[in-house]
Amino acid sequence: MPTVTRRFMLAASVAVAGSALGLSPAAAQADYPNQTISMICAFPAGSGADVIVRFFAEKIAKVSGATIIVENKPGAGGNIAGQYVTRSKPDGYTIFFHTGSAVAGNMHMFKTPPFDVVKDLQVAATVNKQPHMIAVPVSSPIKTMKELTEYLKKEGSNASYAVNNTSGKVLAAIYKQEAGLETVEVAYKSSADSMNDIMSGAMAFAAQDPVFSLSQLREGRYRLLAVSSAKRIPGAPDVPTMTEAGYPMDQVGWFAMMVPSATPKDTVNKINGWTRQVLGQEDVRKFVTDQGGDVFVSTPEEGQEYLKKEVAAWAGYVKVANIPQQ
């Protein structure tokens, strides 16, 4: 009996000491955040995604009172950054700020994904939705999707189009399948790399990201024919959807903040609360609109369900776009 008492007292003493030092999980959770938060970006510094991550990191730092740094870990379609986060301590101090559509797609584009996005990550907060766009140069006589389709059917495999990422590839592939086209895909490293061929007319059209497409629209270089979202976007309200043009789809990229799945619920809810607060700010909503997106607010539970649906949807997208597994 004395031995049991001594053990009990020792355990109690350790627990009290740990709590006093801020070492117990419950205390650490209640204190969150009390150290620097790292937001992990899967794209290089200076990229469009990096601009979005850094913008929100600054805004969330202000409402949370936390010090937030952005770490860029590009490569393997986001898998390097994602794996880094899944292996990190589930305490809310390492946040994966990435496109949910990309991690969902990776589940089907890699033979052996390094992690299971649904099992290993929890969506803490969603931020925005961004469609891709069908664009032609302003010098093109084509002004509508109907005219583009008529032209492409006439040209057959003599016509080509430009893509530079997976979402653009999927958008164009769905369009080709729905319209029964033989147009040839030409892949570029970036939207900027394809500019000369698009402006010269060597490419019949481009399926590109909204940030680049809208910037070219504002500078008078592009004419936008359609967006891939189910509804028109605030940043280009006059541009119809692919569905309106006769090609039903709701294929969008969406940004989310994800944490390791074992992260305490209270911590996840704090991140969600900060993000909701930030998304309610007028300048933030304008930023999202200017980037070609629409604000996307959800609870962690709703975000996780959306992620599950995206994983299922991307199985079909990858098949339609004939994307080989890596």
Can you say where each PLM-predicted feature lies in the sequence?
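N-terminal (or domain-start) structured segment
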Residues: A28-K119, S157-N158, S167-G168, G180-A204, ...
